[in-house]
UniProtKB/Swiss-Prot annotation:
Xref: PANTHER family: GLUCAN ENDO-1,6-BETA-GLUCOSIDASE B (PTHR31297), PUTATIVE-RELATED (PTHR31297:SF13)
InterPro entries to which the protein is assigned, alphabetical: Glyco_hydro_5, Glycoside_hydrolase_SF, Glycosyl_hydrolase_5
Activity relative to temperature: Optimum temperature is 50 degrees Celsius.
Subcellular location: Secreted
Reactions this protein catalyses: Hydrolysis of (1->4)-beta-D-xylans, to remove successive D-xylose residues from the non-reducing termini
Gene name linked to the record: Xyl5
Entry GO CC: cell surface; extracellular region
Record Gene3D superfamilies: Glycosidases
Keyword set, alphabetical order: Glycoprotein, Glycosidase, Hydrolase, Secreted
List of catalytic residues: E188, E292
Source domain of life: Eukaryota
Name used for this protein in its record: Beta-xylosidase
Function: Catalyzes the hydrolysis of xylo-oligomers to xylose units and plays an important role in xylan degradation. Can also perform the transglycosylation of xylose and alcohol. Has no endoglucanase activity.
Gene Ontology molecular-function annotations: beta-glucosidase activity; xylan 1,4-beta-xylosidase activity
Length: 476
């Protein structure tokens, strides 16, 4: 078997035949996220808190079993049965390097990544390696696992150097694996000055190519993979490279401006948002990969009788997005495969030990809107509105927009700092205390809640994906 490669606007096999990658991201696994697995704040915070409550040995046991159960042969078989052929694998740099011991490789970091890559290969599924978290945080969000809203990765050359080092290690380790479709060196960068990202891409491209001339690279645009406007003629320096957009639609979230009825105007808005992200690539005849997209879904414990109607609306959004992608023969990776019930193709049953243990805590999280992703802040909006009003009153209008505006509005920034960082921080210990006194056997059972056999399927979502995967396969 030969490597996939980028040729013009397409991904092709060794014979030059087009390969359209259709799949999902394995978010919440080797890069945990609060809304995916139900904790507050950032992964580094809960790992430290759990070690403090149950001890380092039991904490490491729990997280290792979590990684083991989260994706197994059964998951890969199910994924393949849907007609999908690629999984994006987000991972945290901390699996391979410690902040207090930089540039010293942790070989155990490869344990689960190798395992899942091999399982996927066995089932004929390609993988894309996605560095989702970098030292200092490469973006302003929780999923860069930095605990702040400032992307310090761009402020410190040493942080950048460490990731160059890490990709050299990864390239040497994986250079001969042809089931890896390519490397996604940095997820959703947010460089306020734009130019530092391009300079870093030049460096990581050279570092990877020094060890691995074969694998394709998938480079995210700036500002959450939405903006290539400052890339200039950089493509002339990067061979075998595709460019990654993340095409989330506001219609797929609780803050949608209006109900989505698939009107001509709404479909036109979907198309225009997507086309704007890929303008730079289209002007140059370059390959585009949609590395993330997808709605979130209502849950009966929160939305009650409105759940089904809300979700049918979200499926309409997804269908219309995929229709656009199919016409362009676009490779895509929906976000995401597995979670606790908000966005995943499969989700942990509410009857499992994990969901039973955290039922009341998850309800509190939802009420306080401490996760940023798809938050419904209606129950606490009155608490934060005075702060928003104060800023609007006291800060000149021309100074109210701070990067990454307009992606973040003023109210979003207040929510990120006050709810998603500050209040979340106070709930980290409460999350960890749920594990106090648990035996090794109980910790294993809690972790096993995430195993495929303990998950439910979001059939409406999976049918949409399967239908569209088959359309692409037929050349529709």
């Amino acid at each position: 078997m030969a490597y996939l490669k980028v040729s013009g606007t397409k991904i092709v096999d060794k014979d030059g035949n087009e390969v359209i990658l259709r799949g999902a991201g394995l978010g919440g696994w080797m890069n945990m996220e609060n809304f995916i697995t139900g904790y507050p704040g950032c992964e580094f915070q809960i790992r430290a808190a759990l070690a403090d409550v149950v001890g380092q040995e039991k904490s490491e046991f729990f997280f290792d079993k979590f990684l083991e159960y989260f994706f197994t042969d059964a998951d890969a078989a199910f994924f393949k049965s849907l007609g999908l052929n690629c999984i994006r694998l987000p991972f945290n740099y901390r699996h391979f390097e410690d902040d207090m011991n930089p540039r010293v490789l942790k070989p155990e970091g490869f344990k689960h990544l190798d395992r899942v890559i091999d399982i996927c290969a066995k089932h004929g599924i390609y993988t894309v390696l996605d560095l989702h978290t970098a030292p200092g945080g490469q973006n302003t969000d929780w999923h860069s696992d930095a605990g702040t809203h400032i992307a310090k990765f761009w402020e410190h050359k040493d942080f950048q150097d460490r990731v160059i080092w890490l990709w050299e290690e990864l390239a040497q380790h994986y250079r001969d694996n042809t089931w890896i479709a390519g490397y996604n060196p940095l997820n959703e960068p947010t460089d306020p000055y734009q130019t530092r990202l391009i300079a870093w891409y030049d460096r990581v491209y050279a570092a990877i190519r020094k060890h691995d001339p074969h694998h394709a690279l998938f480079l995210d645009g700036n500002t959450f993979a939405s903006d290539f406007s400052h890339f200039g003629d950089a493509e002339k320096r990067w061979e075998n490279t595709a460019y990654a957009i993340h095409d989330y639609s506001v219609f797929g979230f609780p803050a949608a401006p209006e109900p989505y009825v698939s009107s001509e105007a709404q479909r036109r808005r979907l198309r225009r948002s997507y086309e704007k992200k890929r303008e730079w690539m289209d002007a140059r005849g370059l390959c585009v990969w949609n590395g993330e997209f997808g709605p979130v879904y209502a849950r009966r414990e929160y939305e009650g009788d409105l759940t089904d109607s809300i979700n049918e609306e979200r499926y309409r959004v997804l269908k219309d997005q995929l229709e656009i992608y199919n016409k362009d023969r676009l490779s895509w990776s929906i976000w995401l495969y597995k979670d606790i019930g908000f966005q995943g193709m499969v989700h942990v049953s509410r009857d499992t030990p994990y969901m039973t243990l955290f039922r009341d805590f998850l309800a509190k999280k939802h009420r306080l809107a401490i996760d940023a992703w798809g938050a419904d802040d209606s129950a606490v909006r009155h608490v934060y509105q005075p702060l928003i009003d104060l800023i609007k009153q006291e800060v000149k209008p021309e100074h109210q927009e701070l990067y990454p505006a307009p992606v973040w509005k003023l109210s979003d920034r207040v929510g990120r700092l006050a709810r998603n960082i500050l209040v979340s921080e106070f709930l980290v210990r409460e999350w960890a205390e749920h594990f106090r006194g648990k035996s090794t056997e109980e910790l294993d059972a809690i972790a096993k809640s995430f195993a495929f056999e303990n998950c439910l399927h979001r059939d409406g979502l999976n049918k949409v994906l399967t239908d569209n995967a088959s359309l692409v396969a037929q050349g529709a």
